[in-house]
Amino acid sequence: MSVDMTAPEWMHAQITAAEYESWSEEQCAGIENVDGMVVVSPGASKRHNRLARILANALDAAGGADWNADTDFDVRLQDVPLTNRRPDVVVYRADSIDISPTRPEHVLLAAEIVSPGSETTDRVVKLDQYAGSGIPIYWRVELTPAGIPVVNVYLLDSASRRYRDSEVFTGLVKATVPFPVEIDLPGPW
């Protein structure tokens, strides 16, 4: 018995926002779109997902009624060429929960947890894309060799559309932005 390993046609051609919006949720799961091209993301580990959920739960509680924090959904950075990213955690305006697609003007914070294979994308590419689209705050979470989470906080300089370093936390987050929040992230993860 042979298995057909031919990739679907849509993996080799640019897609438009309209084409993407016609796809089912199942088709959109586990992918991002960069300059119209589909980028398949490997499934996250349970540790990665747990860390994202802990961050999202704490940010959601700290954000009050005006802000939601959730995981695993598209943020539309641009329509042409289509660029959607799926930050690990997104803090967004609560009154935009039913607006689709979520756009940068709805987002207060995007967070990425760096995993093996995503280092350059999370440290350089997404940092630049999120800043260029105007997302005010970026959190990049990395694990030390001992498995302790380090949270790097970046704030947008709106004039240059570049992030500047703000705060760095190891293990225990006591952030002042986007709002005061304390998150205990003991390791190892």
Language model segments and positions:
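Gly/Pro/Ser/Thr-rich low-complexity, intrinsically disordered segments predominantly at protein N-termini
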Residues: M1-W189
